[in-house]
């Protein structure tokens, strides 16, 4: 080994010992002929002192930031007045005996310590500099700990780690596939997997019983802060299980991951809510439940109302829901109400009713349309007090829920609400199985075409498919969808029935999903599992807004890699071998 220790690990326990350290020059300064170098590696920094009597003093004097050095030196305590309490190695320094320059560095476009202030494309172009930033190194280390903790947990609980293929067949469901042309099979293509879904279900039919994988998945979709064309997920599947068993496996893994990342393990079991209840209470299927501001159904107050906004909504089978903004009048003025109304319209509403409670009465443009009895009932139902505000949405449930969800999220910011805890997990379960696509006159999977319906709802597949609830679930953490999964269909006849509702003919179903369908009719056990976003989990634990901050070499928002300048044009001979012509 070239070194005896890492820079950040040297402390007063090493005083009077000779250590060999390697790293980058983080900074240098000359104080009265004595050279001070801060030597950095991934663990931290240590101060190196090169005295003028040192035989390598002249060589060390040529070192500049980001030069790579090997230093042999004696560890000593700093004088009391020179101790740096902000550095874990701040009590000691290393007096150099030998200095060797292992490599020089050109003038860099930015200093690693300042990389987080640089525009993202430049950071990604020079990622080898950006990753030297201590925050980035911490993020990658945390990601590693998350992956290792997940592996340990599943390995210790009877799961087998199995790799599934990266080159597979295209099944045009969900996002677009990344296609890979075959040289050997002219005119045919592989697809990169959007998930290991069919393979892991086939493994359950194969008797594997418990599978896990740190899996790569690929989706050709428009990007956001929490999306990449390629991502990593902690993927599991289990045989002979109920929803409760799958939840317990996820909760156990999360506990180990949090401990590995230096966080307190969250209390289990996590809170569970039905999809319909979550949408009614929070207006979102991935709510941040740390904030105590809820949506309330107030339709019962207005059953005989003359205010057409609410009466028409109720007459057409819609809902009327409200959010109380505690002391909202202290934070929200008329201009802000107009912006909230614009937000409601952008989210699908025709408008937004708002009221302010002051001097024991409601005020606002719409107050005059309500009767005294309705306003009194509203005040009682929502426990409205002085300076509170009320925001009301009225329309079809599928319109009101997301609108009020958007208003809730904005009110959390406007009211400067504080979360009531650091971490809040929520299992959202029993999503609708299907949703209707009117322009195509067919049903489509609300989440996953392989999700099982609730047993009691199976008869509804023949009469009212839109009312069928499923064993689909999401795990939400602080308003972020962390995992998605379900109990699967393990019978071919039921799976084909659902695919038929989605207008997959038997021939199409056999062509696209034949591998899985054949496995299901060969004695597949009941099974279920989930895929959890490793990138998202690491980003949350690192308190990062974007998953790009926890991925070593991510793409930009346009799926471009500035470091490798890909995607790129390839040579004609390569295209010819693949039987491809570019027009």
Swiss-Prot record:
Source species of the chain: Elusimicrobium minutum (strain Pei191)
Keywords: Aminoacyl-tRNA synthetase, ATP-binding, Cytoplasm, Ligase, Nucleotide-binding, Protein biosynthesis
GO biological process: aspartyl-tRNA aminoacylation
Major subcellular location class: cytoplasm
Organism phylogeny: Bacteria, Pseudomonadati, Elusimicrobiota, Elusimicrobia, Elusimicrobiales
InterPro entries: Aa-tRNA-synt_II (IPR004364), aa-tRNA-synth_II (IPR006195), aa-tRNA-synth_II/BPL/LPL (IPR045864), Asp-tRNA-ligase_1 (IPR004524), Asp-tRNA-ligase_1_N (IPR047089), Asp/Asn-tRNA-synth_IIb (IPR002312), AspRS_core (IPR047090), GAD-like_sf (IPR004115)
E.C. designation(s): 6.1.1.23
Name the record gives this protein: Aspartate--tRNA(Asp/Asn) ligase
Localisation: Cytoplasm
SUPFAM superfamilies per the UniProt record, alphabetical: Class II aaRS and biotin synthetases (SSF55681), GAD domain-like (SSF55261), Nucleic acid-binding proteins (SSF50249)
NCBIfam families registered for this protein in UniProt: aspS_bact, PRK00476.1
GO molecular function: aspartate-tRNA ligase activity; aspartate-tRNA(Asn) ligase activity; ATP binding; nucleic acid binding
Reactions catalysed according to its record: tRNA(Asx) + L-aspartate + ATP = L-aspartyl-tRNA(Asx) + AMP + diphosphate
């Amino acid at each position: 080994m070239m070194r005896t220790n890492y820079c950040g690990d040297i402390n007063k326990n090493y005083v009077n010992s000779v250590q060999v350290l390697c790293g980058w020059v983080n900074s240098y300064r000359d104080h009265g002929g004595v050279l001070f170098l801060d030597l950095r590696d991934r663990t931290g920094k240590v101060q190196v002192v090169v005295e003028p009597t040192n035989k390598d003093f002249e060589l060390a004097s040529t070192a500049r930031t980001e030069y790579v050095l090997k230093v042999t030196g004696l560890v000593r305590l700093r004088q009391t007045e020179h101790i740096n309490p902000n550095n874990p190695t701040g009590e000691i320094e290393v007096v150099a005996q030998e200095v060797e320059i292992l490599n020089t560095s050109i003038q860099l476009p930015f200093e690693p310590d300042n990389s987080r202030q640089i525009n993202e494309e430049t950071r990604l172009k020079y990622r080898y500099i950006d990753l030297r930033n201590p925050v980035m190194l911490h993020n990658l280390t945390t990601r590693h700990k998350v992956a290792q903790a997940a592996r340990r947990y599943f390995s210790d609980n009877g799961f087998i780690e199995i790799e599934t293929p990266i080159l597979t067949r295209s099944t045009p469901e969900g996002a677009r596939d990344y296609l890979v042309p075959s040289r050997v099979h002219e005119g045919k293509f592989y697809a990169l997997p959007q998930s290991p879904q069919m393979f892991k279900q086939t493994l359950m039919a194969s008797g594997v019983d418990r599978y896990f994988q740190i899996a790569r998945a690929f989706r050709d979709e428009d990007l956001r802060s929490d999306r990449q064309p390629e991502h990593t997920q902690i993927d599991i599947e289990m045989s002979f299980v109920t929803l409760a068993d799958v939840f317990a496996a996820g909760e156990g893994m999360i506990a180990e991951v949090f401990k590995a990342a230096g966080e307190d393990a969250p209390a289990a079991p996590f809170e569970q809510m039905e999809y319909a209840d979550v949408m009614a209470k929070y207006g979102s299927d991935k709510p941040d439940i740390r904030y105590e501001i809820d949506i309330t159904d107030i339709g019962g107050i207005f059953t005989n109302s003359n205010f057409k906004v609410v009466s028409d909504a109720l007459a057409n089978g819609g809902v009327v829901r409200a959010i109380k903004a505690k002391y909202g009048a202290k934070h929200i003025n008329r201009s802000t109400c107009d912006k909230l109304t614009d937000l409601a319209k952008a989210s699908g509403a025709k408008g937004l009713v708002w009221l302010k409670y002051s001097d024991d009465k409601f005020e606002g443009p719409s107050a005059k349309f309500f009767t005294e009895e309705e306003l009194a009932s509203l005040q009682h139902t929502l426990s409205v007090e002085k300076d509170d505000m009320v925001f009301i949405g009225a329309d079809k449930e599928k319109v009101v829920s997301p609108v009020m969800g958007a208003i809730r999220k904005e009110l959390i910011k406007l009211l400067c609400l504080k979360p009531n805890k650091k971490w809040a997990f929520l299992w959202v379960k029993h999503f609708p199985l299907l949703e209707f696509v009117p322009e195509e006159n067919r049903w489509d999977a609300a989440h996953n075409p392989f999700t099982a319906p609730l047993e009691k709802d199976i008869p509804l597949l023949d009469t009212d498919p839109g009312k069928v609830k499923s064993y689909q679930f999401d795990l939400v953490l602080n308003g972020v969808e962390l995992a998605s999964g379900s109990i699967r269909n393990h019978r071919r006849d039921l799976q084909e029935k659902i695919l038929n509702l989605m207008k997959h003919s038997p021939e199409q179903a056999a062509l696209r999903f034949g591998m899985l369908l054949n496995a299901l009719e060969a004695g597949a056990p009941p099974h279920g599992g989930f895929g959890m976003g490793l990138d998202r989990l690491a980003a949350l634990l690192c308190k990062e807004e974007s998953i790009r901050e926890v991925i070593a070499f991510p793409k930009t928002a346009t799926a471009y890699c500035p470091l490798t300048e890909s995607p790129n044009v390839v040579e004609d001979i390569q295209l010819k071998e693949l039987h491809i012509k570019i027009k």
